[in-house]
């Protein structure tokens, strides 16, 4: 039976990237790692083997969707918490790109740089969660959003979370500071317990914000859907990954489904932020080309039907008369 902080049972079910760097050393190969019971098959493209093909494609889709959400947020120039939520999406984009590099096998398991890539991935995951937590305070107006205090507090907190998770992960993989592949309690606490507490606090704060300060209750639906997608992804990854993989002949596994659910959860974060944020249209400048309604031109016979054309003192312009230079024109002038 696995003890607290042991990744053996987790890695046997879920094909996590860190599983290749934790666990006992295998006598046959002399390498450290825990192999999952089932994982998605690799695909070959242009003489290149791509690991976790389905999950890799989903990472690309997540990158595209994140860019779209960032563009929508950037178009709201006067929205509350605009800079703060952009930091969250930028970090999520970095995490998705790093996950694509690791899952696709650009940094293959067993290589020398692999533990460093996985440590960066773990650090970015903690930074994303911490950044989301700090975003939760913006709606309470404890401090002015968009100010150096707000932005730099978020950046420093996210950087601290990244550094802690990165160093603990690397120390675990490299057997530094009393940690090691078989002593993973610190890694488990940083990656799972601490992040879970931050997510719980964020959700509780947003529910309190909507129920106490907003008249509209529709944002609660966005929160509920976000929780559902995130929890569903974790359950599919850590409880049913191997069963799903075996049932569909190694074409997909829980990593693909977790990536889909995480993307949907992030999209719900954007939808929630958009629903509680009102833009000051008086001072906003839209980036779309159809901000102003363009009417069709009037017919020629109705174009001059105005009060100005009936003024007896109005002087006709040369643009109102047809161009016909003749003798009469020059004789009148000279």
From Swiss-Prot:
One of its GO terms (cellular component) is endoplasmic reticulum membrane. It is found in: Endoplasmic reticulum membrane. It comes from the Eukaryota. Belongs to the CHS7 family. This is Chitin synthase export chaperone. It is a multi-pass membrane protein. PANTHER family: CHITIN SYNTHASE EXPORT CHAPERONE.
């Amino acid at each position: 039976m696995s003890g607290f902080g042991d990744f053996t049972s987790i890695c046997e079910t879920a094909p996590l990237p860190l599983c290749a760097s934790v666990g006992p050393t295998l006598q046959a190969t002399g390498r450290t790692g825990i192999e999952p019971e089932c994982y998605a098959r690799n695909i070959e493209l242009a003489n290149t083997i791509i690991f976790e093909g389905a999950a890799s494609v989903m990472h690309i889709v997540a990158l595209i969707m994140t860019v779209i959400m960032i563009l929508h947020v950037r178009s709201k120039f006067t929205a509350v918490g605009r800079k703060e939520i952009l930091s969250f999406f930028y970090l999520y984009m970095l995490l998705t790109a790093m996950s694509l590099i690791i899952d696709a096998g650009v940094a293959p398991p067993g290589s020398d740089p692999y533990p460093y890539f996985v440590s960066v991935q773990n650090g970015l995951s903690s930074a994303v969660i911490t950044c989301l937590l700090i975003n939760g305070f913006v709606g309470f107006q404890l401090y002015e959003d968009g100010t150096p205090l707000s932005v730099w507090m978020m950046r420093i907190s996210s950087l601290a979370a990244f550094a802690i998770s990165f160093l603990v992960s690397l120390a675990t993989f490299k057997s530094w500071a009393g940690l090691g592949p078989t002593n993973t309690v610190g890694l488990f606490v940083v990656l799972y317990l601490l992040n879970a507490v931050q997510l719980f606090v964020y959700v509780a704060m947003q529910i309190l914000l909507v129920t106490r300060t907003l008249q509209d209750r529709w944002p609660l639906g966005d929160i509920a859907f976000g929780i559902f997608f995130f929890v569903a992804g974790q359950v599919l990854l850590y409880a049913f990954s191997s069963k799903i993989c075996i049932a569909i002949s190694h074409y997909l596994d829980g990593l693909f489904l977790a990536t889909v659910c995480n993307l949907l959860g992030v999209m719900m974060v954007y939808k929630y932020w958009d629903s509680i944020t009102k833009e000051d249209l008086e001072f906003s400048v839209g980036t779309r080309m159809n901000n102003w309604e363009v009417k069709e031109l009037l017919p020629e016979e109705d174009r001059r039907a105005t009060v100005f054309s009936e003024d007896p003192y109005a002087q006709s312009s040369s643009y109102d008369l047809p161009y016909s230079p003749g003798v009469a024109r020059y004789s009148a002038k000279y």
